[in-house]
Amino acid sequence: MGPRAKTISSLFFLLWVLAEPAENSDFYLPGDYLLGGLFSLHANMKGIVHLNFLQVPMCKEYEVKVIGYNLMQAMRFAVEEINNDSSLLPGVLLGYEIVDVCYISNNVQPVLYFLAHEDNLLPIQEDYSNYISRVVAVIGPDNSESVMTVANFLSLFLLPQITYSAISDELRDKVRFPALLRTTPSADHHIEAMVQLMLHFRWNWIIVLVSSDTYGRDNGQLLGERVARRDICIAFQETLPTLQPNQNMTSEERQRLVTIVDKLQQSTARVVVVFSPDLTLYHFFNEVLRQNFTGAVWIASESWAIDPVLHNLTELRHLGTFLGITIQSVPIPGFSEFREWGPQAGPPPLSRTSQSYTCNQECDNCLNATLSFNTILRLSGERVVYSVYSAVYAVAHALHSLLGCDKSTCTKRVVYPWQLLEEIWKVNFTLLDHQIFFDPQGDVALHLEIVQWQWDRSQNPFQSVASYYPLQRQLKNIQDISWHTINNTIPMSMCSKRCQSGQKKKPVGIHVCCFECIDCLPGTFLNHTEDEYECQACPNNEWSYQSETSCFKRQLVFLEWHEAPTIAVALLAALGFLSTLAILVIFWRHFQTPIVRSAGGPMCFLMLTLLLVAYMVVPVYVGPPKVSTCLCRQALFPLCFTICISCIAVRSFQIVCAFKMASRFPRAYSYWVRYQGPYVSMAFITVLKMVIVVIGMLATGLSPTTRTDPDDPKITIVSCNPNYRNSLLFNTSLDLLLSVVGFSFAYMGKELPTNYNEAKFITLSMTFYFTSSVSLCTFMSAYSGVLVTIVDLLVTVLNLLAISLGYFGPKCYMILFYPERNTPAYFNSMIQGYTMRRD
């Protein structure tokens, strides 16, 4: 005997020993094709190991489950509505056989009963393709644990099973459960709706309470995985003890509840997510009320989100805001009246077609218990009943197709389970304006709703405040919620408040939601999309202030014409240019006079021309540096200035030689005069300066560079040289040496004839140049900010003025105002007087 045969043999034995008689017309309706219904009319949360006693539990001994009876009536209503519909299954009567499964305690016996023949036998066969069971399909049960138990049996026979409220993601596995479908979205969508609700209200610090069964464990784990990817942290997770509402708690169970509520009180989290069957929560909420834990937001899973009995604990309104995830509300016309009429609403009780029957088909108190909650059930929009209603219609449409029905008749024939299953997978119809079809996982994509519990009798007790659409995986239509807070403010549930813009997170503890907020320093920014825990440095050409999320381009700073310092220096340069040009004209008109010739003659025109060129180079300091302007700054201007200073130095040396060294070294002086010593010296100095300039340009380059202003980092200074101070020292080193030489020779000639004594003027010019250059280098060694360029230009213009006015100015003064001293006779008399004094 193979494994399959052994399984069937075991099922036959169980069926034979477990069957007991019971009968109630509310549970049975004869018909051409029977549907099996599994509903929790009573609830035993702990279960019973009843197989050890070979005895089926008596469900009527347990707590009545109002919603379960309501769902059973939805199945009865759907069957009777279909039987009265001439367009669907014309000429065919659907029947049903309904069993109370006591939540999880009574699942095996009913499914064996549904699978057996009328004689309660399950024959051993190699092939069950042609096997005919008592029912053609099973609707239910209501929870995932029971559904898996039942599906393991029904899948062996490919007998269609449609559950209306089991949400476990395990049920999507069609290899394990090929005959299982459901008319409710899976746990994946329920959890996603919860998470999107938390994200919408910025709740990232939550508490999770789960029941100790598979439902609580699986959904708690799924929520933990989902929130971890959304930066939502679980402060703690606790398992609630499994308790019956009418059951006395043990001391351990009571202490367990006290401990859990104590942790709720001490936690800073104010959002509590509860995955638990409804009946296990009565003792828990009584303890919450006893300890007066208020101000929380309670998020209910679908198992208790619309439970009317739990809602009847009106004191819960003081605990905070209750939100629940449940199936969308689809009103079914006529159902409320059908439920209120009870069994009498259906057709008269009929005799069974055979003497086969099963147990747990009685519920004496169900109708009265349901009627006591009739108002709340009606106002709540009859939620979930549509899932049962649509499941029955899905089977009916599949039968309609399988039997080849037309508008008036159907071909009644034997229906095998696997044939009906194939047709159910294909159904696609509209029921009360909703499209019903099964996706590849066997689910119907009905919308979910977020409901808020209300205790105002004039309102819907489960008021819809948002909708979740499984196909788009989006939470939409979020409405205003009546928060049980001061001024109706949205409750806060965050371990740490959100950091402000430009603040990085510093983790505190093990939870990513707990952190300190630290400002990003200037020059750094926070990129939330890349790293919220580290501030990134700005690129070199950008800057940021403290606490920024982006950098901005640094302000490029250079001399501009509209600035006051630039205008002032430009006016000085213009004054120097005009005065130098005037001096050139004066010297040209008095070229043959002794003063001009004693000042250097042709050499004066070279100096004045170079000074004019230097003044004309001043504008290249203004505006953004370019290669051409940098070339003028680093080559043309230094060269012009060096030649001018070298002329002064050579002229000083020449005068000293003529009066003091010619008599002592006549031969050397004759060579100096014969071989044009002054011009050779100037040419040598010029070549040396050109070498220095070329070396400097090769070392630093001509391309403009930028550097950050140390006093204001948001400013970038554009200059021609990346190492401005060293370049200035290198470029002016020869000029400083020449100024010292010129000053020395001028000082040596202080006793020369008055007309040749230029010590005062050369000393003034060279001393000013030397002092200003040293001061500029000192200033630049201590400061490298935006003022360097303007100070450098100012010193340059002042040095040019010192030569133009300090050296040539006195000579022009003598030419213009003392013409009698600009004669050969006067100069000869001065030389004779100097010679006589020496003798």
Swiss-Prot record:
It holds the Pfam family ANF_receptor. It comes from the Eukaryota. One of its GO terms (molecular function) is G protein-coupled receptor activity. Its main location: membrane. Residues 20-566, 624-635, 703-727, 782-784 are extracellular. The keyword Membrane applies. It is a multi-pass membrane protein. This is Taste receptor type 1 member 2. It comes from Homo sapiens (Human). The lineage of its organism: Eukaryota, Metazoa, Chordata, Craniata, Vertebrata. The gene is TAS1R2.
